[in-house]
C-alpha cells in the first residue's frame, strides 16, 4: 500500500507546480454555518480556524500534489506489471481508508459523516471482467473488498461475512448491488464520553 496522501504532505516540487495556489479553488462557507450543524459534526481545531486564505490554498495545493505524486507511483506499479507480463494475472484494488475534508463545510482532515470524509474512491481491475474501465452507481462498502477478492480468486466466499462479492458489479456495472451502506465514526475518548455516530446511505 501507499502512505500518501497523508500529512505531512510531502511530494517533489514538480507536483506542487501543477497547482498554483492562487488558482486552487477554495470552498465557500455560508455565514454562521457552524450554527446550523450539530456540534458533534464539527472536527475543526483552533489552529485550523485561524488559517488565512493563502494558507488554506497552500494546504489544498499540497494535498493535490501528494495525490498526484501517489498516482505517479501507482503508474510505476502498473508499468512493472505490464513489463513483467503479469497484468492479466493480477487483481488491482485502489481505495482509501477514509475520505478527507479540504475546507468543505469549513472542516479539514477526516472523521465526519459528511460525504467528503465518509465516501472513498474504489477502483478494482480484475482479469476477465466485462465491465473493465466502466464506473457504477451501485452502493458498495469496504467490507465488500475481502469477499470480492476471495470470489475473484476462485474460492468459496464464507457465509458468515457481512460484505458481499462485487464480482457481479465488475462484470455488469448496471448490477443493482446492495440497498444501503453504513458509516460510523467515534467522538470523545480520554475523560470525555465516547459517542458513536452513524449514517446510512
PLM segments and residue spans:
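Active-site-proximal cap/lid insertion segments
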Residues: 1-139, 152-160
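C-terminal cap/loop subdomain of S1 sulfatases and analogous C-terminal strand-loop tails that border
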Residues: 98-104, 143-146, 151-201
Amino acid at each position: 500500500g501507499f502512505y500518501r496522501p497523508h500529512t505531512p504532505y510531502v511530494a517533489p516540487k514538480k507536483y506542487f507546480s501543477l497547482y498554483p495556489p492562487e488558482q486552487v479553488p477554495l470552498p465557500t462557507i455560508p455565514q454562521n454555518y457552524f450554527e446550523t450543524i450539530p456540534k458533534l459534526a464539527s472536527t475543526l481545531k483552533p489552529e485550523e480556524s485561524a488559517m488565512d486564505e493563502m494558507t488554506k490554498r497552500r494546504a489544498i495545493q499540497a494535498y493535490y500534489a501528494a495525490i498526484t505524486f501517489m498516482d505517479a507511483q501507482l503508474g510505476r506499479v502498473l508499468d512493472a506489471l505490464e513489463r513483467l507480463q503479469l497484468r492479466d494475472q493480477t487483481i488491482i484494488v485502489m481505495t482509501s481508508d477514509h475520505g478527507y475534508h479540504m475546507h468543505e463545510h469549513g472542516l479539514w482532515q477526516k472523521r465526519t459523516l459528511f460525504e467528503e470524509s465518509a465516501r472513498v474512491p474504489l477502483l478494482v481491475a480484475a482479469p476477465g471482467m466485462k465491465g473493465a474501465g466502466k464506473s457504477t452507481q451501485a452502493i458498495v462498502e469496504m467490507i465488500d473488498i475481502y469477499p470480492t477478492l476471495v470470489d475473484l480468486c476462485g474460492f468459496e466466499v464464507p457465509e458468515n461475512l457481512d460484505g458481499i462479492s462485487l464480482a457481479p458489479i465488475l462484470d455488469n456495472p448496471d448490477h443493482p448491488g446492495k440497498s444501503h451502506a453504513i458509516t460510523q465514526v467515534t467522538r470523545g475518548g480520554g475523560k470525555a464520553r465516547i459517542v458513536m455516530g452513524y449514517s446510512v446511505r
